[in-house]
């Protein structure tokens, strides 16, 4: 049976994971790409990326989504979809958010996978030599979720 998740269940699913699928529009065409994220438990998803296609697209159309799933098998899964607005961060806001992102994901990996990581490059490969990453957030407008347990 498929049922709707409550707002709390949806937020918990988002908070207990760190890999999702970012949806955005570029030239009237939808794109979906895997991305590492951190949900602050309130209303904000923190992400970062190298400069490129998706960052250029999101600067033009700030409406985005993030989908996260936990799939055990065909009869046992949870899925959440968060819709929101892209905002690029800079200066101290970007530094603070990147620190929160790294600290939060390291804690999740330690809790879920029992791995103690020390550097952001151990769980995310978006920072390349001499390249400044684009730090951004999604302010959530709406979050919905579903699950199936047979």
Where are the predicted features?
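Surface loops and adjacent helix of pleckstrin homology
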Residues: 50, 69, 148-150
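Short, structured patches in soluble enzyme cores that scaffold and shape functional sites
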Residues: 26, 68-70, 139-142
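Beta-strand-connecting loop/turn residues
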Residues: 42-44, 62, 141
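Short, basic/aromatic recognition patches
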Residues: 1-20
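Short beta-strand segments
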Residues: 17-50, 66-67
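Helix-adjacent hinge/juxtasegments
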Residues: 54-87
